[in-house]
């Protein structure tokens, strides 16, 4: 179905949604229509049905008339490309355009912008794909943690301006569907033809080009982008602000939904970047004690560097026993799973993958009536799963224990927009030091393959790619 040029009007029927001046008819679960060619027209009977008083005029209008588009030179665009199990490479890739492709058709994306990528981070979720634990196809451009400068804007972008430095939520969202309007931007219904929810450079998340690159296109820019209020201030704190696209909101979401508040005792499973971000977020929320569990001593040392207690999950002592040694109690108020489906066993089983381990442990160590946050990634299709059940996301959970203890659980993607503005203000006004907490380590785009390899070996670092040398120049 096409689109037509029409200024916004109040009190039109509920079936009509506005896409920055492009009037879009709703009715199916497909991605929103993209501006059609000038020859496309709405059928007269459909126009008459929805706009009986104005249908003669509307039906004669062409859809989305063509305008000249200013292009920005990006002939040196490069990106991190997944080549197959364990392999990534930095390769030349196509320049981004203000276009969307759907079912073989390419149309203009007037609501989008093109960003010069200032920083883009390697995420543990990327590692799941690189390890071959998803159905990601070779040739995919990776990267969903993006901060950049606007260098080109579509004609329907009203509030984001050229030169703005912006954080890009990893969730791609339309801003118009029910989920977006209710704040659940992680499961937008209009940006992925196969399932709710989309992300840049991630398997099964809509086919959007990733942002571990020099330039990237962002749709629905006025809705999706968080523009930093002051350019110089943003560049001075860019190592912290780059964490707003994913891991800081994701860690905060895990702690917040678990119920962390003033005086809480908290257990965080996993001392990777998301776990460390969650621990720091728990401190920001007022937790009295934050305990972080992991098997890599370097990562545990990083957690201790900003005031966390730690437990080594390679030891034979039970997790409740280790928590009791710290708190004098075997249970905490809140627990957060920041590990996900590649979890390993405890103690003697620490070298064996047991994907339900963390979920069962957090239920065990959370007090009656407590809360559990689960930002750790779980999938429905794992080619490398330990058994047939795990390969389809079916795990052996002690759900009866969770029920008996009246625990509340929150799972799923973090809706980044729910938290990123507040966390930005906390960064800009020196209320937190997220880059220090996660040990942000800047490397060049060309060094991304080595960053992936080091991260896979358990490095206690959050690798931040610097495609244009902006971060190196500001250090």
Residues covered by each model-derived region:
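Conserved acidic E/D residue at the C-terminus of a beta-strand in Rossmann-like folds
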Residues: 294
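Glycine-rich cofactor phosphate-binding loops and adjacent beta1-alpha1 units
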Residues: 258-260, 285, 301, 306-407, ...
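Short beta-strand element of Class I
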Residues: 288-291
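C-terminal hydrophobic helical "lid"/dimerization subdomain
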Residues: 2, 7-8, 69-75, 106, ...
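NAD(P)H dinucleotide-binding glycine-rich loop of Rossmann-like/cofactor-binding domains
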Residues: 174-269
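N-terminal Rossmann-fold NAD(P) dinucleotide-binding loop
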Residues: 275-276
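Low-complexity proline/serine/threonine-rich segments in eukaryotic and viral proteins
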Residues: 14-69
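Glycine-rich beta-strand-centered segment in the early N-terminal region that forms part
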Residues: 94, 98-121, 130-181, 186, ...
């Amino acid at each position: 179905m096409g689109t037509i040029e029409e200024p916004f009007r109040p009190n039109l029927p509920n079936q009509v949604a506005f896409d920055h001046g492009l009037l879009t008819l709703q009715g199916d679960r497909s991605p929103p229509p993209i501006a059609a060619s000038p020859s496309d027209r709405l059928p007269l009977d459909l126009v008459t049905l929805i706009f009986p008083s104005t249908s003669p005029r509307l039906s004669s209008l062409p859809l989305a008339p063509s305008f000249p588009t200013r292009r920005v030179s990006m002939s040196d665009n490069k990106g991190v490309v997944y080549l197959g199990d364990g392999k990534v490479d930095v390769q030349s890739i196509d320049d981004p355009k203000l276009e969307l492709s759907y079912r073989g058709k390419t149309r203009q994306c007037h609501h989008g912008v093109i960003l010069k990528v200032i920083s883009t981070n390697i995420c543990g979720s990327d590692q799941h794909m690189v390890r071959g634990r998803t159905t990601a196809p070779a040739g995919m451009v990776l990267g969903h943690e993006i901060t950049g400068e606007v260098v080109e804007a579509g004609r329907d972008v009203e509030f984001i301006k050229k030169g703005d430095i912006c954080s890009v939520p990893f969730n791609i969202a339309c801003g118009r569907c029910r989920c977006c309007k209710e704040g659940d931007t992680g499961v937008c219904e209009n940006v992925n033809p196969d399932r709710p929810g989309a992300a840049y450079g991630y398997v099964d998340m809509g086919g959007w080009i990733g942002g571990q690159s020099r330039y990237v296109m962002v749709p629905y820019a006025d809705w999706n982008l968080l523009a930093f209020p002051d350019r110089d201030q943003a560049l001075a704190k860019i190592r912290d602000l780059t964490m707003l696209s994913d891991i800081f909101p994701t860690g905060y979401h895990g702690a917040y939904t678990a119920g962390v508040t003033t005086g809480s005792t908290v257990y965080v499973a996993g001392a990777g970047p998301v776990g460390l971000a969650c621990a720091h977020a728990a401190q920001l929320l007022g937790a009295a004690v934050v305990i972080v569990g992991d098997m890599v001593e370097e990562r545990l040392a990083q957690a201790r560097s900003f005031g966390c207690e730690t437990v080594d999950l390679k030891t034979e002592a039970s997790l409740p026993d280790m928590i009791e040694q710290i708190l004098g109690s075997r249970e905490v108020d809140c627990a957060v799973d920041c590990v996900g489906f590649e979890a390993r066993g405890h103690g003697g089983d620490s070298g064996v993958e047991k994907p339900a381990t963390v979920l069962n442990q957090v239920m065990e160590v959370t007090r009656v009536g407590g809360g559990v946050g689960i930002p750790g990634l779980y999938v429905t299709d794992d080619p490398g799963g330990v058994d047939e059940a795990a390969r389809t996301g079916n795990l052996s959970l002690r759900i009866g224990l969770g029920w008996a203890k009246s625990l509340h659980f929150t799972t799923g993607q973090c809706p980044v927009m729910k938290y990123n503005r507040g966390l930005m203000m906390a960064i800009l006004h020196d209320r937190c030091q997220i880059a220090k907490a996660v040990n942000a380590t800047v490397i060049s785009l060309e060094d991304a393959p080595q960053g992936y390899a080091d991260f896979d070996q358990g490095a206690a670092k959050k690798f931040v790619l610097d495609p244009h040398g902006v971060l190196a120049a500001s250090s």
